[in-house]
Amino acid sequence: MEQGQIGEIEEILINAFPAVEREIYDGWILNFSGGYTYRANCIYPFYHSTYDLEEKVIYCENQYRELLLPAVYKMTEAIPKALDELLEVRGYKNVKYVDVLHCRLEGWTAPKMKCPEHDYEVIRMHRMDEEWLEGVNQLIDIPY
């Protein structure tokens, strides 16, 4: 996958379920949500940066430490190799892998899913609604 495509998909994912607090620091996006989910509590080294790489990593670590959160980086193939190497030297480890699958939905209709006890339906939305948010909060045990 090309870097431009990765960037476009990552922007969609970042905005799909935003963090409670967000800081932009020299092209990096720092998300803070009290520890609920990696995606809402991680550092996206997303855009081009100009500051010294090691100083940026130390700054980010301090920001998360102040909130008693681990500094977690969302890494993709588009991330500069120098950052990956620096994080490894500083003792960071790969903790979780995420596969992002995508396809064109133009002209696609969701099949009705059925099981003996229930009748499920796939609903495609452009924005989350209250019912969806409440369900997600119950699944990951966030007070609602």
Describe each PLM feature range:
Residues 1-11, 39, 44-45, 98, ...:
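Short amphipathic alpha-helix that is part of the acyltransferase structural core
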Residues 1-66, 79-80, 84, 142-144:
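N-terminal charged segments
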Residues 16-18, 23-29, 91, 98-100, ...:
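Bulky hydrophobic/aromatic packing residues
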Residues 49-130:
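Acyl-donor-binding surface of acyltransferase catalytic domains
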